């Protein structure tokens, strides 16, 4: 079992119509644009896709729409999480909608021990559907619990959103040394992951999610290509002009990890429909700042990329 990812990972937004309902036609166009641009995998209805704001029927439609739009070109994963039985129902809906797997988000408003987290993963996932476990917020794994979930046949990967490089380095080593699954995958799931990806790559985490890809695919792909080529000059130019300013802007508003991406999609001429509560819209001043950051990132592209 397992889906193979080849390239940058795309986390689409969930667009809404003017009446507040999910805009499935715009979603299909959004994910097709991303795959056409070069995404190597699509994670729909996850954090950037406002999983927490979708009711189960909407979620199923979102996943099914993405699966049909992509038509097998790259793997499609849906989000799942919350209370353990609710998470399992979302996994069931993802399976029924044709997804290749789920990204398992943390349980709802509770602290848990390592064994408790392992139990959550076991009961929230399906043995016939690939799962990637998300280490963040109240779902913080250590070496022992990470090794235990890596032994579950349906768990193909581990994604870190905690940012503890010390612990993540030890988790990577522990899972690799344990050896149950040599093809087990590790992902950087930090907000604006490009800011930390050089550090994650150095400890054995080659895959990462790019929220910025949703509105700046040329910048995101140029950065990814520079990583693959060890092109330090391009990496530093894009970090200086685009990624570090974007991370600083993200820190200016609660929920901006999602709201900024939707604002960026609007900036490049596509509909997003805004965000659902409790998220709030980007201020007009911050929207202008985002436009300047995007322009600077495009201006910093290598000549051969800018000419495309």
Feature-to-residue mapping (PLM):
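C-terminal alpha-helical cap/extension of soluble enzyme domains
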Residues: 9-15, 37-38, 202-212, 216-308
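A generic alpha-helix structural signal
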Residues: 31, 63, 91, 121, ...
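Catalytic alpha/beta core domains of metabolic enzymes, predominantly
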Residues: 137-246, 250-254
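Short helix-capping segments at alpha-helix termini
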Residues: 68-74, 97-98, 127-129, 151-154, ...
